[in-house]
């Protein structure tokens, strides 16, 4: 068994993270668990691994959208698919999310940005998604973007990405209980079991 929060590692350009982002608050309430939201720059890790994104593999991309379409109704979600992909400015969204985690509104921004990406067709990290998502949650886009684009915030994102790499993380979303990683939205329940029982139960 493990005590304390579950670390929720995600990158804003990840399509499958949409499913986790939009249900995590309900999961936290239902199970009495705290999640620590940890944005990181997955693309840096994938580049080191010479991993080819789904966008360059049509069959995998078709499956991805179908898989999300099948799973979304379980969580009461109605995305308009396919959403714009790949998200070419996801690093901007990651920086804004990281800034928000330090000020207490990060999770709200992430939910708003994913909602606009998957329900309104506004690519995450790009405009109008970023500024509109910030306004949706009562934040000033000019102030936040200045903070997000600062050298200090860029250094923090690199440090968080390094921390993810040290944990062996190679995908988003990943849930970490102690130092035990669970990759994928469909492994969230396994992570909850591991935290409660120290093993996976049926």
Where are these regions (language model features)?
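Structural alpha/beta surface segment adjacent to cysteine/selenocysteine redox centers
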Residues: 12, 18-117, 194
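C-terminal cap of thioredoxin/glutaredoxin-like
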Residues: 3-7, 11-33, 115-202
